[in-house]
């Protein structure tokens, strides 16, 4: 086991201030679910990975219920490259043929998920990994991608799905038994096929079904940026629509912001996009007053 975080260099008065600042937030979120979409640099840099594992353990210890939905795009790209296959994206979604789907299942449900679970358990937490196929968690249907150049037409991007329904029973059972669920965004369809679902979309739908107090989406940028590179700290639904229209929000940010906005409109009380490159970004956002990232509002 690794040594615990060394707080010996922090002055006692500062420690007290940190704890005092966190107290009202611990009260607010105690017993509530917080869904975290985990991805980007936070999943690949060892220092950030360890910090994230410790963060979610601390949340659980103070009575908050973190639920992790992870991505794994870079790891999938690496695995595809090893077999001589290039990744293709349309409107931020990975084109997923049968061979790619096999790689996605192996990478997300195996390598990536187990790395997260083992690290949390290594630092003293109790994490359990599952995919959307376990316990009937995520029912999926094939995603029909609208062709923007041909209205009324759709693009076939293979075994890419969208969430048809979520059965949260297995997640709630794990929470009740003091486990931290770690979920790979793979669903199953009525046609018997597995479907690759964007992790942002799964996180948003899961937060809604769990009636989560907060949805936190980690990125490799400070938050939502305007065209001049300035951070937008607070966005309403109307402002987001305008950013979609003028192309400010594009590529991989499209499903992320769409999912965040849908969650806010569906009753998730607090939705934030945060910079996962900052160590302990999860704790900073949830347990401090520090303005951080971009808040998404439904009105």
Swiss-Prot record:
GO molecular function: acetylglutamate kinase activity; ATP binding
GO cellular component: cytoplasm
InterPro entries hit by this protein: AceGlu_kinase-like_sf (IPR036393), AcgluKinase_fam (IPR004662), ArgB (IPR037528), Asp/Glu/Uridylate_kinase (IPR001048), NAGK-C (IPR041727)
Assigned EC number: 2.7.2.8
Site location (Transition state stabilizer): 37, 256
SUPFAM superfamilies: Carbamate kinase-like
A Pfam family matched in the record: AA_kinase
UniProt keyword list: Amino-acid biosynthesis, Arginine biosynthesis, ATP-binding, Cytoplasm, Kinase, Nucleotide-binding, Transferase
Chief localisation class: cytoplasm
Pathway note: Amino-acid biosynthesis; L-arginine biosynthesis; N(2)-acetyl-L-ornithine from L-glutamate: step 2/4
Gene Ontology biological process terms in this record: arginine biosynthetic process via ornithine; L-arginine biosynthetic process
Reactions performed catalytically: N-acetyl-L-glutamate + ATP = N-acetyl-L-glutamyl 5-phosphate + ADP
NCBIfam families: argB (TIGR00761)
Name of protein: Acetylglutamate kinase
Organism: Burkholderia cenocepacia (strain ATCC BAA-245 / DSM 16553 / LMG 16656 / NCTC 13227 / J2315 / CF5610)
């Amino acid at each position: 086991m690794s040594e615990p975080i060394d707080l010996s260099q922090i002055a006692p008065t500062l420690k007290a201030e940190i704890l005092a600042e966190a107290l009202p937030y611990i009260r607010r979120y105690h017993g509530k679910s917080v869904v975290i979409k985990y991805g980007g640099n936070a999943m690949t840099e060892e220092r950030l990975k360890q910090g994230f594992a410790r963060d979610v353990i601390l949340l659980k210890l103070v009575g908050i219920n973190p639920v992790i939905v992870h991505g794994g795009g870079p790891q999938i790209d690496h695995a595809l490259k090893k077999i001589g296959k290039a990744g293709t994206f349309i409107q931020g979604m990975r084109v997923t043929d049968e061979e790619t789907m096999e790689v996605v299942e192996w990478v997300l449900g195996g390598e990536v998920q187990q790395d997260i679970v083992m690290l949390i358990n290594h630092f003293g937490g109790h994490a359990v990994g599952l995919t959307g196929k376990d316990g009937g968690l995520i029912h999926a249907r094939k995603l029909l991608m609208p062709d923007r150049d041909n209205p009324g037409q759709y693009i076939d991007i293979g075994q890419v799905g969208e969430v048809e329904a979520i059965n949260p029973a297995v997640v709630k059972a794990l929470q009740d038994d003091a486990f931290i669920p770690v979920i790979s965004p793979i669903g199953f369809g009525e046609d018997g096929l597995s479907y690759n679902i964007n992790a942002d979309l799964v996180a948003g739908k899961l937060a809604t079904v769990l009636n989560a107090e907060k949805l936190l989406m980690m990125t490799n940028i400070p938050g939502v940026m305007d065209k001049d590179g300035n951070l937008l700290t607070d966005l309403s639904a109307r402002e987001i629509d305008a950013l979609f229209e003028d192309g400010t929000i594009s590529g991989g940010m499209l499903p992320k912001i769409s999912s965040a906005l849908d969650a806010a409109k569906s009753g998730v009380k607090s939705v934030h996009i945060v910079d996962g490159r900052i160590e302990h970004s999860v704790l900073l956002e949830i347990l401090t007053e520090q303005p951080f990232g971009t808040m998404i509002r439904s009105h």
